[in-house]
From Swiss-Prot:
It comes from Actinobacillus pleuropneumoniae serotype 3 (strain JL03). One of its GO terms (molecular function) is zinc ion binding. This is Glutamate--tRNA ligase. The gene is gltX. It catalyses: tRNA(Glu) + L-glutamate + ATP = L-glutamyl-tRNA(Glu) + AMP + diphosphate. A motif ('HIGH' region) lies at residues 21-31. It is found in: Cytoplasm. Belongs to the class-I aminoacyl-tRNA synthetase family. Glutamate--tRNA ligase type 1 subfamily. The keyword Iron does not apply. One of its GO terms (cellular component) is cytosol. ATP binds at residue 251. Monomer. GO terms for biological process: glutamyl-tRNA aminoacylation. Catalyzes the attachment of glutamate to tRNA(Glu) in a two-step reaction: glutamate is first activated by ATP to form Glu-AMP and then transferred to the acceptor end of tRNA(Glu).
Length: 479
């Protein structure tokens, strides 16, 4: 039987991996980690990474889910050399191989009704036997080929399937445990396990990294590959990801969709760094650049044990990258959140200017965007608790004096604003807090902000002066 390549298989490429999600939902963090491990392993060996969309489940697969998967992969910057390929566009190829297998005696048509199969299963269970097909149709060829039927793979009945899993070590399954797998349904559509095999063969996949839930599929797929005379990839089955409570990660633990993490304000660098450490590590190192991941990652070093997702750790990493990545880079992602929160940044400081100022306090870009609103927009009122403490009648004098000094400035710089604050405190013989706290509340509407000299510089001269005047009038009106 002949291979049908989808792209030139470069003989110099020693490692070719694939990520093959089913478009029945969003790209979740477990799938993203699998994609990352596959991508890193290929890059480590200067190999190739293939993206394949396994959309044979026609009832559950949707274009929206496909788009969400592609969007998630692009956001994570996991670029593929080949693809995306869609299984639904390759049905002719799968059926061609199935027909050849029937001709060569590697597969056979099965005409058994649902009733017969149900009766067979009940009989085997009553005899405490493992339910399996009895190969009734292998010995009976008296049915016309156009009668309703499925096609079954003729699985070996003797021996075992043995493979060395890159994560779990040697795995052996007796062929007596395996049934004659249906590879084509009554409606003529090929089944998942068969499509996967043909795809891996045609795409020259050398290493299959996937979740541990696929372990039971592997011996079936290996037997089909052997029947086709195709090379057997190296398999690596990674463990599941649990929540903080040890239960399987789910929606009740918070975000599980990759794009939900985007929406919640995480940088792709932070999520990638966090995911790579969920089951793999290099000593005590926590922070990895993408280049370091490629250099150091080894699928054989991935843990067999389930990993626990820790949101606090992810937030710590996110804050690290918000502070350490170039502000110009972070600004590209922050802009999305500013737009999402309806903050018009056209009249205010550049995003690159506010990022280093606000990233010390914010854990996510979503928080940073919300905290930056006063740089670009007017606010309706003041924080009640802060106003009760800092907008008493005696705050009018320092605000008025500061307004006078700031108005006189010809240089609207951090240093000049800082000097004006000091001079106000000195002139009135009061502590800096008596100047700074009312000033902060007047300009930001909040009792918390970065240093006020920097804040006022970024808010701008006109806005700052107008807000101080407005605060004075507010306090006087309350008196």
């Amino acid at each position: 039987m002949n291979i049908e390549t989808l792209f030139p298989l470069d003989p110099n490429v020693k490692v070719r991996t694939r990520f093959a999600p089913s478009p029945t939902g969003y790209l979740h963090v477990g799938g993203a980690r699998t994609a990352l491990y596959s991508w890193l392993y290929a890059k480590h060996f200067n190999g190739e990474f293939v993206l394949r969309i396994e959309d044979t489940d026609l009832e559950r697969s949707t274009p929206e889910a496909t788009a969400a998967i592609l969007e998630g992969m692009e956001w994570l910057n996991l670029a593929w050399e080949h693809g995306p390929y869609y299984q639904t566009k390759r049905f002719d190829r799968y059926n061609q191989v199935i027909d050849q297998m029937i001709e060569q005696g590697l597969a056979y048509r099965c005409y058994c009704s649902k009733e017969r199969l149900e009766n067979l299963r009940h009989e085997q269970e009553a005899n405490k036997e493992k339910p399996r097909y009895d190969r009734h149709c292998l010995a009976h060829h008296d049915q016309p080929t156009d009668a309703p039927h499925v096609v079954r793979f003729k699985n070996p009945q003797e021996g075992s399937v043995v493979f060395d899993d890159a994560v779990r070590g040697r795995i052996e399954i007796s062929n007596s445990e395996l049934d004659d797998l249906i590879i084509r349904r009554t409606d003529g559509s090929p089944t998942y396990n068969f499509c996967v095999v043909v795809d891996d063969w045609d795409m020259g996949i050398t290493h299959v990294v996937r979740g541990e839930d696929h372990i039971n599929n592997t011996p079936r797929q290996i037997n089909i590959l052997k029947a086709l005379g195709a090379p057997i990839p190296t398999y690596a089955h990674v463990s599941m990801i649990n929540g903080d409570d040890g239960q399987k990660l789910s929606k009740r633990h918070g975000a599980v969709s990759v794009m939900q993490y985007r929406d919640d304000g995480y940088l792709p660098e932070a999520l990638i760094n966090y995911l790579v450490r969920l089951g793999w590590g290099h000593g005590d190192q926590e922070i990895f650049s993408r280049e370091e991941m490629i250099e150091l990652f080894d699928i054989h070093s991935v843990s067999k044990s389930a990993s626990a997702f820790n949101t606090d750790k992810l937030q710590w990493l996110n804050q690290h990258y918000m502070r350490s990545l170039p502000a110009e880079h972070v600004a590209k992602y922050l802009a999305w959140h500013m737009n999402d929160q309806a903050i018009d940044t056209s009249n205010g400081p550049a995003l690159e200017e506010i990022i280093p100022v606000l990233s010390e306090r914010a854990k996510t870009l979503k928080e940073l965007a919300a905290a930056s609103r006063y740089f670009y927009q007017e606010f309706d009122g003041y924080d009640e608790k802060a106003a009760a403490k800092n907008f008493k009648a005696e705050a009018v004098a320092p605000l008025a004096k500061l307004l006078e000094k700031l108005t006189a400035l010809t240089d609207w710089s951090v240093e000049a604003i800082h000097d004006a604050m000091n001079a106000t405190a000195a002139d009135l013989e009061i502590g800096m807090g008596k100047v700074g706290m009312p000033f902060r509340l007047a300009v930001t509407g909040s009792g918390q902000s970065p240093s006020m000299d920097i804040t006022a510089k970024l808010v701008g001269r006109e806005r700052t002066l107008a807000r101080i005047q407005k605060a004075i009038e507010f306090i006087q009106a309350q008196a």
